[in-house]
């Protein structure tokens, strides 16, 4: 009867969603070399199949590959299209990615107001990176208390760059009382999460004795190592990255004699 037809349709929908998710997982495995040899062509093939089937994670990841030209030729039109389709399904990372595109004028006209709106929506859904991005733009606009609040929220969500931002605020006494020990703790936390910017700052802290004992020789070695690592890092596109490298270069030069 009608109920049997409805049940069959519902089951069909479940199977389809599971199938789309499995295709997404295959794409992710090929993209990251997890359990299989890394193969970007296969990754894109499976991401595309899953995205066309309606999987929002696949839509976002496929958009990211088109955005960054990884495994496919860079195509910002397709990147924006897939980000938007994922965002329509309330995918927080896709909303954040759209925010980044509008903030940088990548594939769309630069529009900071629209960028901040996408960041806000993503942050409300728990996307820590969106809180960090909002914090950065608020900091650049001189709204330091608001920036600090977003950095703190992002750090609570384990965003590594947010720990770098908080460390700078404590190191320089911005909005909060100057506290070298707390600055160093922030950098240590961010470094453990993989932040190269935190690694650069932490090396500098050890060399200059910020928040702890000064270790000139060991500090210099750490600074040089951090700088070499920074040159090769995929973080290079991050806000403030070039300025951090320049600060570390200056610190090394001033302390080598």
Language-model-detected regions and their locations in the chain:
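TPR/TPR-like (Sel1-like) alpha-helical repeat modules
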Residues: 214-232
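Canonical positions in the second alpha-helix
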Residues: 13, 49-50, 85-86, 121-122, ...
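Short helix-capping/linker turns of helical repeat alpha-solenoids
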Residues: 17-20, 32-34, 39, 52-55, ...
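Hydrophobic face of amphipathic alpha-helices that form TPR/SEL1-like repeat modules
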Residues: 23-32, 59-68, 95-104, 131-140, ...
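Single conserved hydrophobic/aromatic residue that forms the stacking wall/gate
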Residues: 1-18
């Amino acid at each position: 009867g009608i109920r049997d037809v409805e049940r069959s349709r519902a089951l069909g929908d479940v199977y389809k969603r599971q199938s789309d998710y499995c295709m997404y997982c295959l794409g992710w495995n090929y993209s990251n070399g997890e359990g299989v040899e890394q193969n970007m062509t296969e990754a894109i093939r499976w991401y595309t199949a899953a995205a066309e089937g309606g999987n929002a994670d696949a839509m976002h990841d496929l958009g990211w590959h088109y955005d960054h030209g990884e495994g496919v030729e860079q195509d910002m039109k397709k990147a924006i299209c897939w980000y938007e389709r994922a965002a329509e399904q309330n995918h927080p990372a896709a909303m954040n990615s759209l925010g980044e595109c509008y903030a940088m004028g990548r594939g769309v006209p630069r529009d900071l107001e629209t960028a901040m709106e996408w960041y806000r929506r993503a942050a409300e859904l728990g996307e820590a990176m969106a809180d960090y991005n909002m914090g950065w733009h608020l900091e650049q606009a001189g709204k330091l208390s608001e920036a600090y609040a977003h950095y703190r929220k992002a750090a609570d969500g384990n965003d590594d760059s947010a720990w770098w931002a908080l460390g700078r605020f404590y190191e320089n006494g911005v909005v909060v009382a100057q506290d070298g020990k707390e600055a160093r703790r922030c950098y240590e936390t961010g470094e453990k999460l993989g932040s190269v910017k935190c690694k650069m700052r932490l090396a500098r802290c050890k060399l200059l004795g910020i928040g702890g004992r000064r270790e000139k020789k060991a500090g210099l070695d750490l600074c040089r190592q951090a700088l070499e690592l920074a040159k090769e890092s995929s973080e290079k596109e991050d806000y403030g990255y070039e300025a951090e490298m320049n600060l570390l270069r200056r610190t090394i030069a001033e302390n080598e004699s």
